[in-house]
Amino acid sequence: MAQLVKAAQAGFDEKNDALVTVEPIASGIEIEITSKVIRQYGDQIKSVILNTVKEAGYDGVKVIVQDKNAWDYTIKARVLGALERGSKA
């Protein structure tokens, strides 16, 4: 399992992007999403985040996403970038 050792961010708070913050927690994966399209796409956004964190082999992560209508691949890239920045080298 990969280990998150510090809080980190990736992305931008701009149109068609997402600002992703990851923070270490004791265990599990927590997801917090802020988005104008949460009613329509909230489940899909959450699924992309959860699958990305699991596929990368992390546990004990809180993911906070401020979505500005980002595509799935953008969200995935931002989550992976934040995880890498906050990981043990």
Residue spans for each PLM region:
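N-terminal intrinsically disordered, cationic/polar leader segments
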Residues: 1-89
